Curated annotation (Swiss-Prot):
Residues of the signal peptide: 1-23
Bias (Low complexity) ranges: 136-175
Protein's name according to its UniProt entry: Lysozyme C-like protein DDB_G0288143
The entry's keywords: Disulfide bond, Signal
Coiled coil stretches, renumbered: none
The keyword RNA-binding belongs to this UniProt entry's keyword annotation: no
Active site positions: E55
Organism whose genome encodes this protein: Dictyostelium discoideum
Residue span of region Disordered: 133-187
InterPro entries linked: Lysozyme-like_dom_sf (IPR023346)
Amino acid sequence: MKVSNLISTITIASALCLSLTNALVFSPCDKIQSLVKEYFDETIVDEMMCIAYNEAINPKSDSIGLWNLKKEHCNTVCKSICNSEIDLADIKLNTQCAEMVYLEFGFNGWDSYNNGLCKDSWGFCNTQNELRQHGSHSSTSRDSSSSSSRDSTGTGYSSSGSGTSGSGSNSGQTGHFIPGQSGHGLN
């Protein structure tokens, strides 16, 4: 095979792979919502979405994963599915363990709920999905700019970002998961 044919084949294969990977784009809200609906009763979906949203990034915590679970849970509540804290890095096992924590402690298993961040009706992801459907917010294009804000629940959320470099800024209460921002492990 000639080098030019090999390069053409690689180029076509790469373009095909890129088009397939761009065919389905899920927001972090979609990913979290899918996990929540798989493991939790539908009556608590909003609360668990809020807990995941607020617990995913907590720079002051040594807890693990989307649900910010304590490593001790592997020896107690989650011992049937978890052998070590490393297991909690698996998002599905982390969510299964979160379900067990909820069954054992209820919402009191999470500081974000105890601090009042998730006690009121919370529909941030529903709002983001509505904005996307109506064209007011685009998270599917890598070259788009976006800006959104929410302050009705007192969390002071606001963010803005643009471009393919992932640059942007957010302001508001620290320690909150900001959909679309890097660093939360859901991109």
